[in-house]
């Protein structure tokens, strides 16, 4: 009898401990609101929420914590409720800390541009899953029939199916007023089936909108993802900017993009960075590029493209006479691709930025590009050719090309093999460049003479901001000389802490010690005139 009574008493206590009363839940909301709005070390770093915003967050946190704890309690029907209370408190504390670290303006950030466009943005704060209840809270301004939003960004949040259903209903009601949509990184961590379902919902909701900007990057789309957005992509006839970066764009996915795009006449920006495109995929992208007469900014970097795909892209780009920015970094074009690009660059006279690092161009490809650019792109501002196995053999042509670009602001030739001779030629080439801001010749087997020549040239320029010659073979004396030149502007010199004074040039192991010989080399090359081509 005593044991039975004790068991009954435990069960009664269990009921009293869980669920908490309404007043207890309201009290927790009040306490969290107070904690969130109290100045702390976190608020000094992330900002302090207003009482109104804190109260909304506190209510949402309590609801989520209660749901989690209640589910825990239901899974342990014989428990006394103690563990559920513990989960309730722990989850509330965790979510409250997330909000404090997130800072204010979490609900949405609204910006009004000069042309009157209104921008709705929920990408701020920590990357997180979003379910229906939070979606209703976050997207409330969009659901207001009086809203005038024309641009939206839903990135950095992962939408579940239920949240997507609500979001889709909202987007469907305002799609006619939207001109820019950013859905980058909006299904992260979701199972493939759910992610594709979410994509389909958003696609259907936005079908028929007249967008000028569409960003679907960072979603690991692949062909399935591209086709999940088929109804949206296929209905866009006025696109000016399309971003498909870090999306698993394979050969088949690239073909799907080509198939689904109904019109490319107005596209000015097209970016495919960091995909698994390969040569066959590059051929499909080339077919898109060929039909983009208005293209101004093309990026296809880190896409595993070899010589065959490089040649296809180069030939397609010949049709883009308005191109200003070209980024093909980190592919395997090789010499053949470089020569094809040279032919293309000769007709792209409006280029202002060229990024061709890590393409395996070697001297032959570099010479071809240099000769082509000598007669093209007179307003070039950025030139990057890092990591292309460039030696002094092709530096003469390259220096002549650089000397002809008086608008050049940024030059990156890092991770090549220019050595002193090539470096001194480059230094002479930029002598008259009054707009030069940044030069990177790190990791180029440069010794004292080359380092001194380049430093002397750039340090006296009023516009100059950063020189990087780290990772070379500069002697201790050379380092001291360079540091002394920059003693009044040390922020303009990347520290030389990775320099190796004992570095060996294995092609010339018998080279004599620096010093007088370095001065002789500098003097000899300094008297050379850089040939800038024949008219």
UniProtKB/Swiss-Prot annotation:
Q: Where in the cell is it found?
A: Cytoplasm; Nucleus envelope; Nucleus membrane; Cytoplasm, Cytoskeleton, Spindle
Q: Where is this region: Disordered?
A: 493-535
Keyword list (alphabetical) reads:
Cytoplasm, Cytoskeleton, GTPase activation, Leucine-rich repeat, Membrane, Nucleus, Repeat
Which SUPFAM superfamilies does the record associate with it?
A: RNI-like
Stretches of Acidic residues bias are at: 497-520
List, alphabetically, the GO terms of the cellular component aspect.
cell division site; cell plate; cytosol; nuclear envelope; nuclear membrane; phragmoplast; spindle
Q: What does this protein do?
A: GTPase activator for the nuclear Ras-related regulatory protein Ran, converting it to the putatively inactive GDP-bound state. Plays a role in spatial signaling during cell division.
Free-text comment about domains: The WPP domain is required for the nuclear envelope localization.
Regarding protein family, the annotation reads:
Belongs to the RNA1 family.
Q: What is this protein called?
A: RAN GTPase-activating protein 1
Species: Arabidopsis thaliana (Mouse-ear cress)
Question: Coding gene?
Answer: RANGAP1
């Amino acid at each position: 009898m005593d044991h039975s009574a004790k068991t009954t008493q435990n069960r009664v206590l269990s009921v009293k401990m869980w669920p908490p009363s309404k007043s207890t839940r309201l009290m927790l909301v009040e306490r969290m609101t107070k904690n969130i709005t109290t100045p702390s070390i976190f608020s000094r770093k992330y900002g302090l929420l207003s009482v109104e915003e804190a109260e909304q967050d506190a209510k949402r946190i309590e609801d989520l914590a209660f749901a989690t704890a209640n589910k825990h309690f239901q899974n342990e029907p014989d428990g006394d409720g103690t563990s559920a209370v513990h989960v309730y408190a722990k989850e509330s504390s965790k979510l409250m800390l997330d909000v404090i670290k997130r800072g204010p303006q979490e609900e949405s950030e609204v910006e009004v541009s000069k042309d009157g466009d209104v921008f709705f943005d929920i990408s701020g704060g920590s990357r997180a899953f979003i379910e229906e209840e939070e979606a209703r809270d976050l997207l409330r301004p969009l659901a207001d029939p009086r809203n005038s939003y024309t641009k939206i960004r839903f990135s950095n949040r992962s939408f579940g199916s239920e949240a997507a259903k609500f979001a889709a209903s909202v987007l469907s009601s305002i799609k006619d007023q939207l001109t820019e949509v950013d859905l980058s990184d909006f299904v992260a961590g979701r199972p493939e089936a759910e992610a594709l379902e979410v994509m389909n919902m958003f696609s259907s909701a936005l079908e028929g909108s007249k967008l000028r900007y569409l960003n679907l990057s960072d979603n690991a789309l692949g062909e399935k993802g591209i086709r999940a957005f088929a109804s949206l992509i296929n209905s866009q006839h006025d696109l000016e900017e399309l971003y498909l970066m870090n999306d698993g764009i394979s050969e088949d996915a690239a073909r799907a993009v080509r198939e689904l795009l109904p019109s490319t006449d107005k596209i000015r920006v097209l970016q495919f960075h960091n995909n698994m495109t390969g040569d066959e995929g590059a051929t499909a992208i080339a077919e898109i590029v060929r039909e983009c007469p208005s293209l101004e900014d093309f990026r296809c970097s880190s896409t595993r493209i070899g010589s065959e795909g490089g040649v296809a892209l180069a030939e397609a780009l010949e049709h883009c006479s308005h191109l200003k920015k070209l980024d093909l970094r980190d592919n395997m074009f090789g010499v053949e691709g470089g020569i094809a690009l040279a032919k293309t660059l000769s007709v792209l006279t409006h280029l202002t930025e060229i990024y061709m690092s890590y393409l395996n161009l070697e001297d032959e490809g570099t010479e071809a590009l240099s000769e082509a650019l000598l007669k093209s792109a007179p307003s070039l501002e950025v030139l990057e050719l890092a990591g292309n196995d460039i030696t002094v053999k092709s530096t003469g042509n390259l220096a002549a090309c650089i000397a002809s670009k008086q608008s050049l602001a940024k030059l990156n030739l890092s991770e090549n093999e220019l050595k002193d001779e090539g470096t001194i030629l480059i230094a002479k080439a930029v002598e008259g460049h009054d707009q030069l801001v940044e030069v990177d010749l790190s990791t180029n087997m440069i010794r004292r003479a080359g380092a001194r020549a380049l430093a002397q040239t750039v340090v006296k320029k009023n516009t100059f901001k950063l020189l990087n010659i780290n990772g070379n073979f500069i002697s201790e004396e050379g380092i001291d000389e360079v540091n002394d030149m920059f003693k009044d502007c040390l922020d303009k010199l990347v520290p030389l802490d990775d320099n190796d004074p004992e570095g060996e040039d294995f092609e010339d192991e018998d080279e004599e010690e620096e010093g007088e010989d370095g001065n002789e080399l500098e003097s000899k090359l300094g008297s050379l005139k850089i040939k800038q081509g024949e008219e």
